[in-house]
Amino acid sequence: PSMEPAAEMEISGRGHGEHKLLHAAELLVDPRIDYLDMSLWDVFKDVHDAAFAGEPLLKVFTDLPRKGVALGAAGKLYSAKACEAAIASGLDFVLVGRAAVVHADFPRQALTNANFEMQALPVTRDHLAAQGLGPKFIDYMATWDGFVAA
């Protein structure tokens, strides 16, 4: 599908990150797409590409035109307030990874307690087991620096 001319003009000539941004822009106006979820590693970091210097990475994507395509992202969303800030920045939904591993009920906790935060890392193997993680997954998580206490 072709993009609207206005969307093309907004992102043309922006250098190195243009290809990925152009692809996201095309998806956000594609009537076959219900939602686009992005793993940004840190939804609040600034863009490293010189063409977008000083802009929050999230803003680069939330400013793109959307035609009924919901936009979500993951990346260091470790508290209810961080999730709320990401939504306020223009996302339609958020995805939690590590926070949901550390707290299987993170979404419920975040919705009912605006001050809820993920427990500080590292966490114990017992804590992860209590969240429903199996021994093999806990062993895998132990390979992540600073995630599982020795």
Where are the regions that the model predicts?
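Flavin-dependent oxidoreductase catalytic cores
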Residues: 1-150
